């Protein structure tokens, strides 16, 4: 509907033809109203040529043409597949993961290993693997037992630098700038001893000293035993008298009967008795003289 005066029909036909020509023009072309400066309007063929030049003018690295065509075929699989057959195995850059690639038709569900939510408890041992399973189980039990024992016997222990003095002490530039006048002082490690270490060390020293003293006493006793004299004269006399009593057949202190030959025996000199008396007197000098065999008391 239109209000107001309208153009005649013959003029409307010319306007319709101009609109059809404008529709045939390229979309996006600038519409010009009014007079135009000569040379400003660009021909259609030159404009298309300029657009092609803009499309081909690329700055920096560009994707090869065959790769670009292949990517276009992936995005539009319904297009020509001849180029895909020409370059079936060529790929540039990182490949698309398989789960992002378009799939055609039904697909097999993926496997997630042997795990299943329906399995409850350990799986039964395969036939023929009973011995291997028993060995593995025994080995695991031994390892578990050793780990438990180590955990029970574990005792916390401080590191060495926390319990001992450094072997080499330095003043770190804070000492006197003179030569040392005395000997180098030794490191005092007595304060590092544990409560029972000092007592144990003293006992070991005492036991070693006692062993040395006992050995020295044994050597002195052997020397004294070699140098000491034998039994005294009284002991020798008593021993001989006891032997005579045993030979007579009577015990010591026992009363023996009267014997005429022994009791009435004349104590005078017998023939040849003088020589025997002289020999017996010679023995007196040996008894009261110094001993020849035993020179030490």
Swiss-Prot record:
Pfam families: DUF3752. It comes from the Eukaryota. Residues 88-101 have a biased composition (Polar residues). Residues 41-52, 147-161, 236-268 have a biased composition (Basic and acidic residues). Residues 19-133, 147-214, 226-277 are annotated as: Disordered. InterPro entries: DUF3752, GPAM1-like. PANTHER family: GPALPP MOTIFS-CONTAINING PROTEIN 1. This is Uncharacterized protein F26A3.7. It comes from Caenorhabditis elegans.
């Amino acid at each position: 509907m239109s209000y107001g005066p309208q153009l005649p029909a013959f003029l409307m036909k010319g306007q319709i033809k101009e609109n059809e020509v404008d529709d045939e023009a390229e979309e996006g072309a600038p519409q010009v109203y009014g007079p135009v400066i000569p040379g400003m309007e660009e021909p259609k063929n030159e404009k298309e040529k300029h657009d092609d030049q803009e499309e081909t003018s690329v700055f920096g690295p560009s994707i090869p043409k065959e790769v670009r065509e292949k990517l276009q075929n992936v995005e539009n699989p319904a297009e020509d597949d001849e180029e895909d057959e020409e370059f079936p195995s060529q790929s540039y850059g990182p490949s698309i993961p398989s789960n992002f690639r378009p799939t055609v038709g039904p697909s097999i569900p993926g496997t997630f290993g042997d795990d299943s939510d329906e399995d409850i408890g350990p799986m039964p041992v395969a036939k023929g693997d009973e011995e291997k399973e028993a060995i593995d189980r025994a080995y695991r039990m031994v390892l578990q037992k050793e780990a438990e024992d180590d955990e029970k016997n574990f005792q916390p222990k401080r590191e060495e630098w926390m319990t001992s003095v450094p072997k080499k002490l330095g003043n770190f530039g804070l000492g006197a700038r003179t030569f040392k006048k005395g000997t180098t002082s030794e490191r005092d490690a007595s304060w590092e001893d544990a409560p029972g270490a000092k007592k144990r060390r003293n006992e070991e020293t005492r036991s070693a000293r006692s062993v040395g003293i006992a050995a020295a006493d044994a050597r002195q006793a052997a020397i004294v035993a070699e140098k000491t004299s034998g039994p005294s004269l009284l002991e020798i006399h008593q021993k001989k008298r006891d032997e005579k009593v045993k030979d007579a057949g009577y015990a010591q202190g026992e009363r023996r009967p009267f014997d005429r030959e022994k009791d009435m025996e004349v104590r005078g000199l017998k023939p040849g008795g003088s020589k025997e008396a002289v020999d017996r007197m010679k023995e007196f000098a040996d008894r009261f003289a110094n001993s020849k065999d035993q020179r030490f008391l």
